[in-house]
């Protein structure tokens, strides 16, 4: 029974991924109209930020299931497959729907934007497709213990999950305007998807020693994340993600 604990945690990851999808797909979008500018927009209620919360919880559980599996010597092929299936949902599909909703809001701001083709929104689902490919490649690759090939899907999912929090809690007009620009989101889709499917070496966030050379990349990422969190709030998440990518390329 003890050896099933990691699998139960993995399924809990999947559960919160499903909760994130529910929060991101919630109905109740509001059509607004600015009488001063004549601009129309779709405003999605603030509760979409719960999708970000559920993805964050899924990420914590995703870390714990691997830790518990190693602790109890309960690693198994079943656990490996369950982990990948759960990650596709929690860090691929759920973030993809968040992007879909932001694209919908961005395009609705244009003249006749509410009548725009759904085709403009479909690129959002490149993210879960790229994540699934990355996980499939990881499952058959035996060389990704200390160094990953491409950004792991949880990191990609977390950075996308941070954008609703940035949008609703930054109180910065410039940031909000950027997040309501469809071309910004097309850029996010391209960059995040590419980073997942590429074979660039990325640091596996696992401690394998206590010497400075091993710890330095982790210290840099943690320092940037903490300082950024104090200065710019939730914007610290994409900044930490960018730091992770840069540090991985420098400390190969």
Range-by-range predicted roles:
Residues 1, 44-50, 75, 111-120, ...:
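Short juxtamembrane and helix-loop transition motifs at transmembrane-helix boundaries
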Residues 1-63, 240:
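Topogenic membrane-insertion module of multi-pass membrane proteins
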Residues 1-14, 48, 68-88, 135-155, ...:
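Interhelical loop and helix-boundary elements at the membrane-water interface
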Residues 18-26, 92-102, 159-166:
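Membrane-interfacial alpha-helical segments at the cytosolic side of multi-pass membrane proteins
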Residues 32-38, 106-113, 170-179, 204-206:
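Membrane-interface helix termini and inter-helical loops of multi-pass transporters
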Residues 45-46, 53, 71-134:
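Multi-pass membrane catalytic core of lipid/isoprenoid biosynthesis enzymes
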Residues 50-60, 115-129, 179-191:
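Structural signature of hydrophobic alpha-helical transmembrane segments
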Residues 145-252:
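C-terminal membrane-associated helical module and adjoining short loops/tails
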